[in-house]
């Protein structure tokens, strides 16, 4: 089991920050769909996160996605990202 010393949360709606996070070498990068994203930007954030997981080199960083709460009306859409092959897991 690998030790995880750093966990970097990044708003999923900000491509520039996602790109930067991919290059920093954190043990885990958590792409946030919950508090870090305005309600009006949730759909765009899902698209950016999917693009980032497909196109960016995160090196050895584990990739996680923090999904919205079950009662938010957003979680079902968020969970579609769970099947992405470059995603390690979800943060509930």
Where are these regions (language model features)?
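Expand to "…catalyze enediolate/carbanion chemistry for C-C bond making/breaking, isomerization
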Residues: 1-92
């Amino acid at each position: 089991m690998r030790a995880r010393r750093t966990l970097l949360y990044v708003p999923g709606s900000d491509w520039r920050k996602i790109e930067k996070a991919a290059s920093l070498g954190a043990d885990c990068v958590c792409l946030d769909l919950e508090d870090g994203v305005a309600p009006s930007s949730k759909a765009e954030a899902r698209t950016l996160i999917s693009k980032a997981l497909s196109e960016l080199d995160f090196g050895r960083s584990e990739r996680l996605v923090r999904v919205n709460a079950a009662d938010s009306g957003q979680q079902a859409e968020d969970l579609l990202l769970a099947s992405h092959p470059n995603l390690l897991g979800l943060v509930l």
